[in-house]
């Protein structure tokens, strides 16, 4: 009869490493998040893509995905997600957040300019003097003429040409500071 060899394992001698169990669902959620990060990378312009720290293999995969369509694009995004799982995606996510935040800040500035333009056309002189106090180097005569033209265009239901010119002037005036 064969004897069973029993191994005696002393747990106290071994260093106790804490085992972290990760559920299959959590792994899938993480993979899906990385795939979405890959989609964001594919949708970036070349100049924005240059600002993100990517290794050459990942960069080539993203540039290839930008040229693909439909099913090939889907498979390439899956592949990009796989490449992202092999590296630390944190620096990539941070760089992407900076780019998106910069875009949101730019949109907010343009929205403020639109509100200022509306205020100038509706309120007239009171808003105009406030603007001149904030920006004394503004061309007073030109801006005043644009505001009057925009008010006339609004009254006569004409296309808002001066209205757009006010926005362009404010954009040049304020965003150059």
Swiss-Prot record:
Any GO BP: assembly of large subunit precursor of preribosome
Function recorded in the entry: Member of a network of 50S ribosomal subunit biogenesis factors which assembles along the 30S-50S interface, preventing incorrect 23S rRNA structures from forming. Promotes peptidyl transferase center (PTC) maturation.
UniProt cross-references to PANTHER family, sorted A to Z: UPF0307 PROTEIN YJGA (PTHR38101:SF1)
InterPro entries associated with the record: DarP, DarP_sf
Localization: Cytoplasm
Family: Belongs to the DarP family.
Protein keywords: Cytoplasm, Ribosome biogenesis, RNA-binding, rRNA-binding
GO CC annotations, alphabetized: cytosol
Organism listed in the record: Histophilus somni (strain 2336)
Main location group: cytoplasm
Protein name: Dual-action ribosomal maturation protein DarP
Source superkingdom: Bacteria
One Gene Ontology MF term: ribosome binding
